[in-house]
């Protein structure tokens, strides 16, 4: 018997009518790029997260790349990333011209291992990009302390943990 890796049809079928009706409504509304639907999403998602603001972007890769660009990350820089993550994490670093430096995960959480972060820091390291996986936040107290001790930026990727709470 073949077991599918990921059955998106099964996940989609129970909510297909609702999703398709919303897509059709938005498509028929006209201004769906930077329009009222985006503003509605940003407000609702910020409320869900308990955040004062939210910026809706095309995808997580764009969000990570913009964050790294805002930090001034570029050629010659290194960014510490989890070895266990979606490819967008590494691509965002590469698209800025920097080098992703992989760190293995902790066996108990599958999130980036702070001890591995310490070992991976070089004179070219500019940032740490932890990814909160499977709804489980990374050890941010330790990661923030490491970053502060080495004067590094931290850019958190929460694309796989929407709504998760740390502590």
Regions found by a protein language model. Name each.
Residues 20, 24, 42-46, 66-69, ...:
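Solvent-exposed, non-membrane alpha-helical residues enriched in polar/charged side chains
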Residues 1-31, 36:
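N-terminal "arm"/small-domain region of PLP-dependent enzymes with the aminotransferase-like
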């Amino acid at each position: 018997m073949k077991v599918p890796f990921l059955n998106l049809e099964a996940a989609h079928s129970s909510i297909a009518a609702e999703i398709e009706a919303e897509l059709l409504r938005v498509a028929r509304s006209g201004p769906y790029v930077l329009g009222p639907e985006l503003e509605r999403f940003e407000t609702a998602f910020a409320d869900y997260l308990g955040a004062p603001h939210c910026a809706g972007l095309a995808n997580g890769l764009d969000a990570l790349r913009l964050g790294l660009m805002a930090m001034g990350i570029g050629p010659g820089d290194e960014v510490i990333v989890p070895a266990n993550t979606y490819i967008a994490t590494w691509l965002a670093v590469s698209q800025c011209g920097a080098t992703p430096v992989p760190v293995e995960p902790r066996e108990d959480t599958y999130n980036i291992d702070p001890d591995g972060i310490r070992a991976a820091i070089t004179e070219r390291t500019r940032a740490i990009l932890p990814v909160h996986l499977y709804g489980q936040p990374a050890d941010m107290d330790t990661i923030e302390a490491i970053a502060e001790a080495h004067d590094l930026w931290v850019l958190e990727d929460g694309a796989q943990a929407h709504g998760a709470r740390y502590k």
